Regions:
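The conserved Walker
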Residues: 5-6
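Conserved glycine(s) of the Walker
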Residues: 9
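Hydrophobic positions on the alpha1 helix immediately C-terminal to the Walker A/P-loop
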Residues: 13
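Conserved nucleotide-sensing/catalytic segment adjacent to the nucleotide-binding pocket
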Residues: 25-99
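Short catalytic-loop micro-motif centered on adjacent basic/acidic residues
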Residues: 77-82, 104-106, 139-140
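Conserved phosphate-donor/acceptor-positioning beta-strand/loop module used by diverse small-molecule
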Residues: 97-120
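Conserved GTP-binding G-domain of TRAFAC-class P-loop NTPases and closely related GTPase folds
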Residues: 117-221
């Protein structure tokens, strides 16, 4: 199971785990199901970038159904989430464990300024292809996840429902592994999210800001 705020770069972990499982893993990402909502285009036209609010329940039900069906068949699963609350990951982990699965949690630790910048860049990129399909992430939604990520990780650690917790960064490096580290994952995550900026992060911010400026000018927004 994956966790991290919008724009943090969870796709990075997709690639790492696909390689680890030699491609033998099914990726379940709720966002990818939004466009399959029966009234998707209608909702896009009516609500524009706010349509995410109207497709989230559908996407959630799709994820739930797939997890139930595919776990029954015994597939390796990579389930993407934000860790906005602990309810869904806790319930999912318990369901999978009851079916004999080993359940691990992989988090991506990205500075909030960088992840929010990524959501803005992603919106502009999609807008330049098709303004009707562009999906925005509200700052409130993004920050809510960030502000609860550490505490939710701590609660999940205390529940001890994951056999392993790993923390990755955008450069694909694994900076924490509960099988090797005795420190709390939540403590490490807090330092990575809100601590000192390293040189790579500073450069990512600079190039991201330039990219956003270029896209905004091109889109005339």
């Amino acid at each position: 199971m994956l966790g991290g705020q919008s724009g943090a770069g969870k796709t990075t972990i997709h690639r790492i785990k696909q390689k680890e499982f030699q491609g033998n893993i099914v990726i379940i990402d709720g966002d990818s199901f939004r466009s399959q909502h029966p009234r998707y285009l209608e909702l896009q036209q009516e609500y524009g970038k706010d349509s995410v609010e109207y497709t989230k329940d559908f996407a959630g039900k799709m994820v739930e159904s797939l997890v139930t069906e595919l776990s029954h068949l015994g597939y390796n699963l990579l389930i993407e989430g934000t860790l906005r609350t602990i309810d869904v990951p806790k319930k999912t982990a318990q369901l999978l464990k009851s079916k004999g699965y080993e359940v691990q949690l992989a988090l991506i630790a990205t500075k909030p300024e960088l992840s929010y910048l990524s959501t803005l860049i992603r919106y502009e990129e999609l807008y330049s292809i098709n303004p009707n399909q562009a999906r925005a992430t509200s700052k409130e939604h993004h920050d809510f996840i960030v502000n609860h990520l550490v505490d939710n990780t701590r609660q999940l650690e205390e529940l001890a429902i994951f056999e392993r917790i790993q923390i990755y960064q955008r450069d694909r490096s694994c900076v924490y592994d509960s099988k090797e580290n005795t420190t709390s994952a939540a403590t490490v995550l807090h330092d990575l999210l809100f601590g000192e900026w390293n040189q790579v992060e500073k450069e990512m911010l600079k190039s991201g800001e330039e990219r956003l400026k270029d896209l905004t000018n091109r889109n005339g927004l």
